[in-house]
């Protein structure tokens, strides 16, 4: 074989090898992208969480949904939609530790649930160092009220509702003065948190909680849309575009 022919053959083999290498790299990249998409889809389906980053500024926002009933230490029925605090709390810690996440958007449509679990989630969100915005959709009742006001800024849709009522307890209740005092302590924790993170006074919030004129079989008050803003619970009436716009503004201020 001539030297020139040998050189040409070697060059063709090198080119073929490079082509195969590029093809393999492209396949690996596509596989990685597909794996990431599958993980995101699974995270959205199982936990109601997603990452929003396809915006103009490529700002990374974590989307957290709080829906159904806030599950406590006992598992709810498999037929019930529930938010599990043991899923939410570790994720919030991960968000705080991740420098790439610049903001948190919380969507709420909850009937309430376990007081300790709800307050734990609310305290975690309130203590995050990144900008946070909440949006109440269908409703945010009972322990959902602290969850709605724990962010830096809150929105509610015009037809959204919030119910404020005294603490309820299931199971056996001992008819003693100590039980009443325990209920009062639990209510004080809720009232103190809400009044500290919203524009409503403690006494006014307690009056709404103990209202006897609205509900036929319970104490409490139901507020709709604009009423929550007038009472000082929620900052503004708006939808998803308003919530995202406000979050971008807070993120811009935080980064400047």
Task: Label each region the model flagged.
Residues 1-135, 139-145, 150-165, 169-256:
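N-terminal organellar transit peptides
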